Amino acid sequence: MKVLVVTETDACCGPMAAAFLSDYSPSIEVVSMGRNPSQSVEFLLVAAMRECLIDLEGYVPKGKDDVGSMDFDVVYECPDMPCPKTLEECRMLRDYVKNEAYLFFRGLIAYGR
């Protein structure tokens, strides 16, 4: 199954959600993109995700031109929050995004996706 995660910038919540969804099942191919992609991912995000053993070092935010005409089975409109200013705030956002991604994943299973 191919899932597209959409956020505004693809610099914070989108990459986190995509990483968690990929982690939940090896049968899910996940791509995240932003409507107005940033130049880079927030460095605090990389540190917070590393604590979950997920490496986003070097991730480059993508836009619609990067995704192109790829086909997706499902689009996940990820809740997009402002990027936190401290590592502790980033951890709280990470945990929120992880929970939201898990609920989305459970919904896919419930509807036989």
Model-identified regions with their sequence ranges:
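A general structural motif
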Residues: 27, 71-72
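Conserved active-site segments centered on acidic
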Residues: 1-65
